[in-house]
Structures are given as structure tokens and as C-alpha cells.
Swiss-Prot record:
Keyword Amino-acid biosynthesis found: yes
Entry-linked Gene3D superfamilies: Leucine Dehydrogenase, chain A, domain 1 (3.40.50.10860), NAD(P)-binding Rossmann-like Domain (3.40.50.720)
Protein's gene: aroE
CC per GO annotation: cytosol
Family, similarity comment: Belongs to the shikimate dehydrogenase family.
HAMAP family (alphabetical): Shikimate_DH_AroE
E.C. number(s) listed in UniProt: 1.1.1.25
The UniProt record lists the keyword Cell inner membrane: no
Protein name, entry field: Shikimate dehydrogenase (NADP(+))
Organism of origin: Aliivibrio salmonicida (strain LFI1238)
Assembly behavior: Homodimer.
Recorded GO MF terms: NADP binding; shikimate 3-dehydrogenase (NADP+) activity
Length: 273
């Protein structure tokens, strides 16, 4: 039985074991997947022990994604640009490959909702690790532009500079945003504390799609704000969670599981249905 895991701190609430166990059942893959809570200062020891004892691959969540980036022997292009790793795989020659599947998870979720990205104007709110992880996969969908805004403008500017070689990316001060966008993505965790970004609702219009990377029971505060401002549709990040897991599973096993049934199960659990 091949061994996989997710590392984090804390890790008790992780949905990854549930998701990957269902993926394994669906694809008839002989594997086990467990959650491992590494000490805050003990990730490297924990992950080294895991691979030394037959581990095939693992997911990495907060606060260890940057450490996993340093730990990997080899990095995919999307991991290099993300500056963080959420997926590690032990190759046949013993090399540990680091990848980042977060952005692909977001894009796949948007596409399954039939949200058009090509030639669209995208607003990305936030310039932290979550934003950095999704920029390259979003740019590969050929939007007309991606505008990055952040509470600290300099962080948005630095991010736009890194990714401008890959497509039309610009940084704008939050106070200078005066028009609407086709797709608005909130990459901040503000919704978890019931807060909204300090930006004008002019970003929304009747045809806009809102996407909040956070999720919970019912609408997030960001998506409720978007709906109150007449967006066409609003989605949360639960599908991104399942999408990045499906991409990790594909990296490990070479075949892609279906996300739809698992997403339905998770949504039911979340809503207490």
C-alpha cells in the first residue's frame, strides 16, 4: 500500500485525507493517505522521516509551504514562480520533486463553472502566497489583463514585476481602482474574520463573476458583498481545494480523478445537510 500524507500545523481540520481516500476509491488505486501534524519548528525532520520510511508523496499546507520549497531537490516551473510548494513527490531515482497545484486548482474550478477567462479583465485582490501561486496558471488562460491590488501597494507592484514577463499584469493602488472587472478573485483570508478589502464596489458589475478563495457554511462575506452589488455569480474556494487535490493526485498517480462527486459530498458536510 503506497503511503501519502498532508503536513501542516494545525492539521486536525484538514479535508485532504477525506478527499484523497475518495479519489483512491474512485480510481481503484492502492494507497493510504493520512494527516501529519508536524511541530512548527520540526517540519524538515518530519517530512524526511516520512520519505525515509517509504512515503511516496505528500501535500503541504500552512505554515510549511516555503520550507517545502527549500526541501525539494527539484522544482516545477509553476512551483519556482509560486515561491512555495504544496505537493512533494518522490521520483524513482529518489529525487524529491516540488510542485504547486493551487493555481491549477483555481483555474479548473473556474472552468468547470464555465467562467470564461480568455480575453477577460481579471482583478486579483491580495499579493501574498495565495495570489503568487495562482498568477501563472491564470495567465496561461490568456486573459486580456490581470490587475493586482493589495493593502500594501509595494507588494502588488513586486508581484506584477515578477509575472509581467508571462502576460499583461499590472499593479494598481486600491484607492485608484475606478472601473469594473469581468472576474474578481479575492485571494486574501479577510472573509475568515468577517472583513472586506478596502476597495470600492465599483469593481463589480452585472456581468461580473466573483470568486473568494475562502469558504465556509453559506456565503462568504466577500461573496455576499459582491452579490449585494449585482454580480452575475459568486463562487467560494471549496472547489479550488478539491481541484488542487485532484492535480496533486494526478502528479502522484498519473491519472486524473473526477472532482464533482467529492465536491458535492464536501458541500453537503459543510452545510450540515
Amino acid at each position: 500500500m503506497d503511503k501519502y500524507a498532508v503536513f501542516g500545523h494545525p492539521i486536525k481540520q484538514s479535508k485532504s485525507p477525506f478527499i484523497h481516500t475518495l479519489f483512491a476509491r474512485q480510481t481503484i488505486q492502492p494507497l493510504e493517505y493520512v494527516a501529519i501534524e508536524a511541530p512548527v519548528d520540526g517540519f524538515l525532520n518530519s517530512v524526511t522521516h516520512f520519505f525515509s520510511n517509504g512515503g511516496k508523496g505528500c501535500n503541504i499546507t500552512v505554515p510549511f509551504k516555503e520550507e517545502a520549497f527549500q526541501f525539494a531537490d527539484q522544482l516545477t516551473d509553476r512551483a519556482k514562480l509560486a515561491g512555495a510548494v504544496n505537493t512533494l513527490k518522490k521520483l524513482d531515482d529518489g529525487i524529491i520533486l516540488g510542485d504547486n497545484t493551487d493555481g491549477e486548482g483555481l483555474v479548473q474550478d473556474l472552468l468547470q463553472y464555465q467562467v470564461p477567462l480568455q480575453d477577460k479583465r481579471i482583478l486579483l485582490i491580495g499579493a501574498g502566497g495565495a495570489a503568487r501561486g495562482v498568477l501563472l496558471p491564470l495567465l496561461k488562460q490568456n486573459p486580456s489583463s490581470i490587475t493586482v491590488v493589495n493593502r500594501t501597494y509595494e507588494k502588488a507592484e513586486a508581484l506584477a514585476e515578477i509575472f509581467s514577463a508571462y502576460g499583461a499584469v499590472e499593479a494598481v493602488r486600491m484607492s485608484d481602482v475606478t472601473r469594473s472587472f469581468d472576474v474578481i478573485i479575492n485571494s486574501t483570508s479577510a472573509s475568515l474574520s468577517g472583513e472586506l478589502p478596502n476597495i470600492s464596489p465599483v469593481i463589480f458589475s452585472k456581468g461580473s463573476i466573483s470568486y473568494d478563495m475562502m469558504y465556509g457554511k453559506g456565503k462568504t462575506v466577500f461573496n455576499q458583498w459582491a452579490l449585494d452589488n449585482d454580480v452575475y455569480q459568486a463562487y467560494d474556494g471549496l472547489g479550488m481545494l478539491v481541484g488542487q487535490a485532484a492535480e496533486s493526485f494526478t502528479v502522484w498517480r498519473g491519472l486524473r480523478p473526477s472532482s464533482k462527486q467529492i465536491l458535492r459530498e464536501l458541500r453537503k458536510n459543510l452545510e450540515g445537510m
